[in-house]
Design a protein with these regions (language model features):
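Conserved catalytic-core helix/loop/strand module for nucleotide-ribose chemistry
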Residues: 1-148, 156-159, 163-178
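Extended basic-aromatic, gly/pro-enriched interface segments that bind polyanionic ligands
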Residues: 153
């Protein structure tokens, strides 16, 4: 739905993409300026609703079944779901947070890997997500190997993060990807 809208609304921007590339989220987003990216994403985020999966995940985080939730989503739905149970986990935006603070991120946190829709910078394009994966390589390796971790947002094969996990996961703690 989002890619279809980008293809319709920004057709002129996508002229130099192949038909196959026009189906690729990262390739399409790379043809939009940040304000256009943010506007199109905000439209979908404003419609997003909490569901039972968000509530269950919030409960797992609150009860320490998961160390951290690492999300590719820009929305705050999980944070809102946590608040329904009077739980207010720290939330971090690693798109703008300095690397020197990464080791201080506690368990029971929600960590936005590609930014937050209300933030200053979003990793949307193929180039920006690859760069972000490289920037977070050590953080991801440390996180997935020191406590149970859950990734949420998409299948993972969509950018360089899946390869990072595949290469660095030792299997000593549970890893979930939903």
């Amino acid at each position: 739905e989002l890619i279809t809208e980008i293809n319709k609304k920004y057709k002129g921007n996508l002229r130099d993409l192949s038909d196959n590339e026009k189906k690729d989220y990262g390739k399409c987003m790379s043809k939009l300026v940040p304000s256009e990216q943010k506007a199109i994403i905000e439209k979908y985020i404003s419609k997003a609703k909490i569901n039972w999966a968000h509530i269950a995940l919030a409960s797992l985080l609150k009860k320490d079944y998961i160390g951290k939730v690492l999300t590719f989503n820009f929305d705050n739905i999980l944070t809102r779901a946590c608040s329904l149970d009077n739980f207010f986990p720290p939330t971090y935006d690693l798109q703008v947070l300095s690397e020197k603070y990464f080791s201080s991120i506690p368990n029971k946190s929600i960590v936005h890997l590609h930014g937050q829709w209300s933030g200053f910078d979003l990793a949307n394009s193929s180039d920006s997500t690859e760069k972000q994966a490289e920037n977070l390589k050590h953080y991801i390796k440390e996180t997935i190997n020191t406590s149970p971790t859950m990734f949420i947002g998409y299948s993972g094969g969509a950018d360089a993060f899946f390869k990072l996990v595949e290469e660095n996961f030792t299997g000593h703690h549970r890893l979930y990807w939903i």
